[in-house]
Amino acid sequence: LNGRNKILKLKKTTIFDETYNASPESVKACINNLLDSPNNHFLIFGSMQELGSESKKYHKDIFDFINRSDIKKCIFICDRNDEIYYADYLKKSNKFLFFNEITHIAETINKYTKKGDFVLVKGSRNWQLEKILKLID
């Protein structure tokens, strides 16, 4: 199935393509797989959808997990309404960048990565993160 357990070796980076969907458990499992790789680790994380009233709690749990990890930079994609809430929570961390759409994400991650780095791309289907894979170096 496209977007699940797919590894793409590109000219500069290796991409873990997990773009098909996201749940709190699968995000943590994929981050752990990423961290087993050598060199620098980056995450492109589209917000998880359909979590109901627990959504903010689940996202905060993932953010704490990322903050405690070796991930150099996390590009987080969320709706504008959620950005205000999450930005306030994450402003003390320099690991996170916020976007409301996928337009400039590949360009941004390409500025941070160097040869041999690893990038995990994970998020809910509605973000269509697979569209940016071919734009990452």
Report the location of each language-model feature.
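ATP-dependent carboxylate-amine ligase
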Residues: L1-D137
